[in-house]
Every structure is written in C-alpha cells, then in structure tokens.
Amino acid sequence: MASLKKSLFLVLFLGLVSLSICEEEKRENEEDAEDENHEEESEEKRGLLDFAKHVIGIASKLGKRSEEKRFWPFMGKRSEEKRFWPFMGKRSEE
C-alpha cells in the first residue's frame, strides 16, 4: 500500500510539473504574439502616417496649382496675369 501511495504521489507530482512547464511556455508564446502584434500595429501606423503625408503633399501641390491658374488657366501664373492685365492688380516693374 505504501509503494502504491508513493507511486501515485510521484505521478501527480510529475504531472503538475509538466503542467506548469506547459503553462509557462504558453505564456511566453502569448507574450511573443502580443509583441509581434504591437510591432505590426506600429508599422501600420507608420505606413498610414507616410500615406497621409504623401496625400497632404499632393493636395498642397494641387492647391498651389489651382491658385496659380484660378483666373485665366491659359495665362499661367498670377505674376504673368499682372503683367498682361495691369488693371487686375498692381503693375509689376518687369
């Protein structure tokens, strides 16, 4: 009977040890997965910021272009408009 108790305790002890080792590995894997997810999220944010900067840059270029060609699109820049149409603004000395 005593040997049966010893072997039963030994089996239970080894089972608990292996269970705790598996739980530790599972926690480590979850932490690694969280770190990878965090890195992916930060890369996505960086990608979105780069895309937003690119879109803003294009929009500002388009805004400048539309401002230059607002009145007479076939004439060119506003400085050229003033040269050809002095009554629209101050006369340039060019």
From Swiss-Prot:
Residues 1-22 form the signal peptide. One of its GO terms (biological process) is defense response to Gram-positive bacterium. The keyword Cytoplasm does not apply. It holds the Pfam family FSAP_sig_propep. Keywords: Amidation, Amphibian defense peptide, Antibiotic, Antimicrobial, Secreted, Signal. Expressed by the skin glands. Residues 30-42 have a biased composition (Acidic residues). The modification Methionine amide is found at M75, M88. Transmembrane segments: none annotated. One of its GO terms (cellular component) is extracellular region. The keyword Lyase does not apply. It is found in: Secreted. Residues 23-46, 66-70, 79-83, 92-94 form a propeptide. The modification Leucine amide is found at L62. Residues 27-46 are annotated as: Disordered. It comes from the Eukaryota. Fallaxidin-1.3 shows no antibacterial activity against Gram-positive or Gram-negative bacteria. Does not inhibit the formation of NO by neuronal nitric oxide synthase. Has no effect on splenocyte proliferation or smooth muscle contraction. Belongs to the frog skin active peptide (FSAP) family. Brevinin subfamily. This is Preprofallaxidin-9. It comes from Litoria fallax (Eastern dwarf tree frog).
